[in-house]
Design a protein with these regions (language model features):
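Conserved beta-alpha
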Residues: 9-167
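N-terminal amphipathic/basic-hydrophobic helices that include classical n-h-c signal peptides
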Residues: 1-8
């Protein structure tokens, strides 16, 4: 027993860092946990996506009117697509089709369009499922709003499927 090194005392956790934005309502389980365990919770989003300016988008010579479908991979993509459309004074037509990576992204579209009226298709998180839905609409011209750091699997899947798309 004399040869054993002394054991360090366990330290009590006082602060937790959560890598997402602070919830807008006080009904979040994080606040309940903080109150129950007497913790301090810091909310810091680690990923910050800055939208492209309308002028910068125009310089890329992408014509929104030439696209009949949009591939949306996140809620941020939805927000930035409609912000750019508004900046460019482009009225999104009723015939526009939306291909969303998940059901939650599809429901988020309700913020901008009437869900029943438009043609909205969604997968369940896997992009391959979205590609399978897109194969039924192969004659569409797709727009893929994305960041500079896009997974290579998404353009690879679109190229393999032979889709006409613009990033």
């Amino acid at each position: 027993k004399d040869l054993e090194p002394p054991r360090p005392m366990a330290q009590k956790i006082k602060t937790i860092l959560i890598s997402q934005p602070k919830p807008s309502t006080e009904k979040s389980p994080y606040f309940d946990l903080a109150e129950k365990l007497k913790l301090t919770i810091d909310f810091r989003p680690f990923i910050h996506v800055e939208g492209m300016e309308g002028q910068e988008f125009r310089q890329q010579r992408v014509d929104l009117a030439q696209h009949s479908a949009v591939i949306l991979t996140s809620r941020l993509a939805v927000d930035h697509y409609f912000r750019i459309a508004k900046e460019m004074r482009f009225e999104v037509p009723d015939s526009m089709k939306y291909f969303c990576i998940s059901e939650s992204t599809a429901y988020y579209l309700q913020k901008y369009v009437q869900y029943r009226k438009r043609k909205i298709f969604h997968g369940t998180i896997k992009f391959d499922e979205v590609v399978a839905l897109m194969k039924k609409h192969k004659n569409e011209t797709f727009l893929l709003p994305c960041s500079d750091l896009l997974k290579s699997s998404i353009p690879n899947a679109l190229d393999a499927g032979g889709f006409n798309y613009t990033k």
